[in-house]
Regions:
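Post-HEXXH active-site segment of zinc metalloproteases
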Residues: 74, 90-121
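Hydrophobic or amphipathic, alpha-helical segments that drive membrane association/targeting
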Residues: 1-11, 33-46
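Active-site scaffold of zinc-dependent metalloenzymes
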Residues: 40-75, 90-91
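Long, well-structured alpha-helical subdomains associated
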Residues: 113-116, 127-152
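Zn2+-dependent metallopeptidase catalytic core
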Residues: 11-32
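Surface-exposed helix-capping loop/turn segments at secondary-structure junctions
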Residues: 26-32, 94-96, 134-142
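Active-site recognition of the HExxH zinc-binding catalytic motif
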Residues: 78-91, 123
Length: 152
């Protein structure tokens, strides 16, 4: 079960709700999670999205996801999925904070370049696969009449 609060400008409410609902019910159905998704200008930060926890760093259950406003639909969905992968990493404990430093497994990721951080590599690898899975499972990739038989 999760709680979702959205705010900001330049986003599609139904898409945000739909992607989040699909991801949370598929990958974390038994966890009680509080999600706050804020849409705002992030261009100065040179990012499309951020994910951070808002409560206890040992077992975080409240998260803030910030997303760039006015993205294309595909980029928006992929970015939201990417940040939700980080939520899953925090919840399952593969990403954690210890003594003020962030770790992925036993690797201190703060000394690594962003592109080399293992939790980012995992999220980037999964975002494309999960994006396609989302489109297929929600019927957006293939309209019902054109869907391959094994997907009906």
């Amino acid at each position: 079960m999760y709680y979702l609060q959205m705010s900001g400008y330049g986003y599609r409410k139904r898409i945000c709700e739909g992607v989040t609902d699909w991801f949370m019910n598929r990958y974390m159905p038994r966890h009680i999670i509080d999600l706050r998704v804020v849409h705002r200008g992030l261009k100065r930060d040179l990012v499309y999205g951020w994910c951070d926890f808002e409560d206890n760093y040992k077992r975080p259950r409240a998260f803030l996801i910030e997303l760039q406003s006015n993205m294309s639909l595909e980029l928006y969905i992929k970015t939201l999925i990417h940040e939700l992968v980080h939520v899953r990493q925090w919840v399952f404990g593969s990403l954690r904070q210890k003594r003020g430093k962030m770790y992925y497994g036993s690797t201190n990721v703060e000394d690594l370049d962003y592109d080399d951080q293992p939790h980012e590599i995992e999220a980037r690898e999964q975002e494309e696969t999960l994006y396609i899975t989302y489109l297929i499972e929600t019927g957006q990739m293939f309209p019902r009449k054109n869907r391959p038989r094994h997907l009906l």
